Structure formats: C-alpha cells, structure tokens
Amino acid sequence: MCPLRSLLLISTLVLLHHLPHLSLGRSLPITTAGPGRSCLDYSQNLLRAVSNTLQKARQTLEFYSCTSEEIDHEDITKDKTSTVEACLPLELATNESCLASRETSLITNGHCLASGKTSFMTTLCLRSIYKDLKMYHMEFQAINAKLLMDPKRQVSLDQNMLAAIAELMQALNFDSETVPQKPSLEELDFYKTKVKLCILLHAFRIRAVTIDRMMSYLSSS
C-alpha cells in the first residue's frame, strides 16, 4: 500500500497545479529536524516574502484588478519546466506502484540534503525547482526595472523577495542550468507592467507553496 504521506503530497501538488485560483493561506505541517533543513528554511522564508509582497501589491494596486478573482492567471513555466511531475514522491513515480527502489543515487553540490547524496528523481525535482526560481527571478528583475522608471513610483518589488529567491537558488546550487526563457520585451506601458506584476506574484505564490511543501516532504523523508 502506498504511504499515506506520499499520497497526501501528490494530491496537494496536483491540486495546486490545476486550481491556481484557490486560496493558499495555510501550509502543511512541517518537520523541523532532519536532512534538508537549510532549504526548508529558505523555502519558508521565500513563501513569507512573496506572500507579503503580494499583499502589499494588492493594497497599492487596488484599482489594477490585482485580486486572484480578477487577474488572468498565467504560468510562465508552462511547457518549460515540469516541477509538479518531477517532484512526485518516488513511491508513486515508478511503474505506478509503491515498490520503487531508492538505491539509485547521485551526488549533488547543493545544501538541500545534508548528505549531498540523493535519488535521481529527487535531483530532477530540485533541478526543476531551480529552473522555476531562475525564470521568475529574471521576470521580476525585468519588471522591477520598468517600475523604477515610472515617474509615479507607485509600486516596486520588495528586495526581500528577490533576495529570498536568490538564497534558495544558491542553496540548490544548479548554477550550470540554463532556462528556456528570456524576460519578455514589451513596450514601456506602466499600467500593463503593474497588471503583469500582479499576475506574476499570484502565480509565483502558488509555486512557492508547492516548493515549500516539497522541501517539507524532503526534510522529513
């Protein structure tokens, strides 16, 4: 029989993937000890940072259709990464059974697993998370550069969020990875830029919840 914890995790990941409009204010219980604690700290910090940034943006841009119900949801990682699929628990990712072996392992350079040794599937998961973070980091930097040119200076990105993304990327340590996307080069329209910011923040918060749940799972495994 499949471990109940694995089934709960995959149910959550699939739900987050297909229902982006859900409210995600609560997190799954986490374990504070064991391997992966460092990256769990970073993922929790990232989730707090993006949640705070989104809340501030919704308050500042209340006339820009910045609520979850008003925006057009967009996933910039679609067809470019496969984090939900890559982060399936190994028990559910092999031959559709719960008898998968954990013997296959790789040596990783990151700090998300205390031993530095992890399964092939876990490495794929962490690499996909890194690519997600890198894509969003590039997009947020491009948007922030435009916002800083706005004479009104109505809103700008919280540097704490950008720092939180960078910290988790550094901990994952897949520096050689390339991402299949460059920041979009649109005309300098500050209204569209602010709407785009709202769209990205909502999407990234959902992804941050997924990442936090996955780090919690790895930490307690």
From Swiss-Prot:
It is found in: Secreted. Heterodimer with IL12B; disulfide-linked. This heterodimer is known as interleukin IL-12. Heterodimer with EBI3/IL27B; not disulfide-linked. This heterodimer is known as interleukin IL-35. Interacts with NBR1; this interaction promotes IL-12 secretion. Keywords: Cytokine, Disulfide bond, Glycoprotein, Growth factor, Secreted, Signal. GO terms for molecular function: cytokine activity; growth factor activity; interleukin-12 receptor binding. Disulfide bonds join C39-C112, C66-C198, C87-C125. The keyword Lipid metabolism does not apply. The gene is IL12A. It comes from Capra hircus (Goat). This is Interleukin-12 subunit alpha. GO terms for cellular component: extracellular space. It comes from the Eukaryota. Residues 1-25 form the signal peptide.
